C-alpha cells in the first residue's frame, strides 16, 4: 500500500513538474512571439545607391516577418561626417538593438568599433577583409558578418574595351579616404594594364576637389572609371557635368549611376544587395551565431547601358553586348 502511495505521489509530482515546464515554455514562446525586435541601421551618406540598399534591407526584413509592431527600426545617417559615425554608432549600441547594420564601409567600421557584443551586419561592403571587418569570409570570427559586393572588375575592363576600343588612357577617379576604393583601383589597374590600357589615378580627399580634378582629367584621358566610392557617388552629378562637356564617357560600378549619366557598368542591383543584407540579419535574429553565418559574397553583375549617353557620344554598342545588357536609359528616337 505504501509503495502504491509513493508511486502515485511521484506520478503526481512528475505531472506537476511537466505542467510547470510546459507552462514556462508556452510563456517563453508567447513572449518571443510578442517581442519587439530592435534593428539599428547606420547609413554613411545619402546617395541613390545607398538609399536603395537601405530600402532593400527594410523590405527584406518585412518579407521575413519583421514588420509593423513586431520590429523597431532606427535609421541614422552620418551624411559623410566621420565624427557623426562614431557618435551614431555609440547611440545605436546604447539603444540595445538586437542587431546593427552598417551601410557602406565607414558605417560598418564605426559599428564594429563601438561593440563586440551586438551582431554587426555589413551592408554591401566591397572589401571587408581589407577594411579589417573580418579576417575570414567563410568563418567570421567576431561579431561581424553580412554581405560583400565585390565589383566584377575583369568584366568591366572587357566592357570598356568593347564599347570604346579607341580609348587608350583610362582615368580612375576615387576618394583617397575610402579604404574600399583602394583595393578596387588596384584590381582595375591590374586587369586594364594587362589588356594594354594606360591607367592614371586621380584621388581626391573630398567632394570639394572633384570639379577641379575633373578639369585636369578631361584633358588627359579617353574615358573615366569610378569604383564603388561613396564620396564620388554623392557628387556624381559634378563628374557627369564635366565629362559631358568634354565628351568623355564615364564607366561606373553601380546601376543607379548609369541612370544618372554614366555610359555603362557591369552593375549589381543595389536594392537586391540590401535584401541580401537583410537575409544575413534575419539568420542572426532567428538565433544563428555570427560565426555560423558566412559573409554572403556577391561578385557577379549585369552589363547595364545608358543608350542616351551612347547616342550623345556617338558610341555604337556592339550587338553581342546589347543582347546581354540591361538598359537603364533608352536612346532618343
PLM segments and residue spans:
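Hydrophobic alpha-helical segments within soluble ligand-binding/sensing domains
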Residues: 128-167, 269-288
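Pocket-lining segment of extracytoplasmic ligand-binding domains
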Residues: 179-248, 254
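Flexible loop/turn connectors
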Residues: 257-308
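An alpha-beta-alpha
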Residues: 57, 145-192, 294-310
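Beta-alpha junction/loop-to-helix N-cap segments that form part of ligand/metal-binding clefts
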Residues: 75-135, 229-244, 248
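Extracytoplasmic "Venus flytrap"
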Residues: 36-58, 64, 74-83, 177, ...
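Flexible loop/hinge segments that line or gate small-molecule binding clefts
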Residues: 110, 117-153, 250-264
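Short, low-complexity disordered leader/linker segments with a strong preference
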Residues: 1-37
Amino acid at each position: 500500500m505504501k509503495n502504491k502511495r509513493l508511486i502515485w505521489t511521484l506520478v503526481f509530482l512528475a505531472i506537476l513538474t511537466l505542467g510547470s515546464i510546459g507552462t514556462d515554455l508556452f510563456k517563453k514562446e508567447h513572449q518571443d512571439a510578442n517581442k519587439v525586435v530592435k534593428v539599428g541601421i547606420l547609413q554613411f551618406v545619402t546617395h541613390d545607391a545607398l538609399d536603395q540598399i537601405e530600402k532593400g534591407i527594410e523590405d527584406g526584413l518585412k518579407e521575413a516577418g519583421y514588420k509593423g509592431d513586431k520590429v523597431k527600426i532606427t535609421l541614422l545617417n552620418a551624411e559623410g561626417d566621420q565624427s557623426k559615425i562614431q557618435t551614431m554608432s555609440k547611440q545605436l549600441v546604447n539603444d540595445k538593438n538586437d542587431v546593427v547594420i552598417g551601410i557602406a564601409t565607414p558605417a560598418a567600421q564605426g559599428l564594429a568599433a563601438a561593440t563586440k557584443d551586438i551582431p554587426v551586419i555589413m551592408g554591401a561592403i566591397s572589401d571587408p577583409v581589407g577594411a579589417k571587418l573580418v579576417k575570414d569570409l567563410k568563418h567570421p570570427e567576431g561579431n561581424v558578418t553580412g554581405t560583400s559586393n565585390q565589383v566584377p572588375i575583369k568584366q568591366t575592363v572587357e566592357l570598356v574595351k568593347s564599347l570604346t576600343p579607341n580609348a587608350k588612357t583610362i582615368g580612375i577617379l576615387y576618394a583617397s579616404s575610402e579604404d574600399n576604393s583602394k583595393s578596387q583601383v588596384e584590381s582595375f589597374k591590374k586587369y586594364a594594364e594587362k589588356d594594354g590600357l594606360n591607367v592614371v589615378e586621380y584621388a581626391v580627399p573630398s567632394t570639394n576637389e572633384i570639379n577641379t580634378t575633373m578639369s585636369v582629367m578631361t584633358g588627359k584621358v579617353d574615358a573615366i572609371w569610378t569604383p564603388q566610392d561613396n564620396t564620388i557617388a554623392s557628387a556624381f552629378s559634378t563628374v557627369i557635368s564635366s565629362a559631358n562637356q568634354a565628351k568623355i564617357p564615364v564607366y561606373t560600378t553601380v546601376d543607379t549611376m548609369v541612370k544618372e549619366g554614366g555610359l555603362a557598368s557591369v552593375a549589381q542591383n543595389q536594392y537586391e544587395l540590401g535584401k541580401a543584407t537583410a537575409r544575413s540579419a534575419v539568420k542572426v535574429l532567428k538565433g544563428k551565431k555570427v560565426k555560423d553565418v558566412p559573409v554572403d559574397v556577391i561578385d557577379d553583375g549585369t552589363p547595364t547601358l545608358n543608350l542616351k549617353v551612347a547616342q550623345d557620344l556617338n558610341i555604337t554598342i556592339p550587338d553581342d553586348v546589347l543582347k546581354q545588357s540591361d538598359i537603364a536609359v533608352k536612346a532618343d528616337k
